[in-house]
Amino acid sequence: MSRRPLGKLRIIGGQWRSRIVDFVDGDGVRPTPDRVRQTLYDWLAPHIEGAEVLDLFAGSGALGLEALSRGAAFVSFCERGAEQAQAIREALKKLGAANAQVRQDEALALLARETKQYDLVLLDPPYASDLLPQALALLPPRLKAHNRV
């Protein structure tokens, strides 16, 4: 089976600002637009440095990669697609990021059995799915005090 075409993702802030990494283009995977990421991370700026982050429905990895670039202590990426998960691993390797893990798994299944707690959880499920309310219902035990979703 051949790999699908690769798209390009630009990191917009932090230590890897302007670095380009690949993502698998397909299955509705689209990186969160630059403008949205910039706004999101402007809001989150005081909470990123040193945070332990869970990037659910990671897709291209854009949100978690931005968190690492901006000083997160650790990011756990959860992506069900094998090709997408591998592309995130390759991006992390290209960037030299050792403080991350990529788990190829269903987000809801991972939340149901996960024991670790996080400072910040990034949620960007597929647009046409009903996964957001289900994920939000499973989140409380995974969040540290004074957390962000």
Regions flagged by a language model, labelled:
Residues 1-149:
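Class I S-adenosyl-L-methionine-dependent methyltransferase catalytic core
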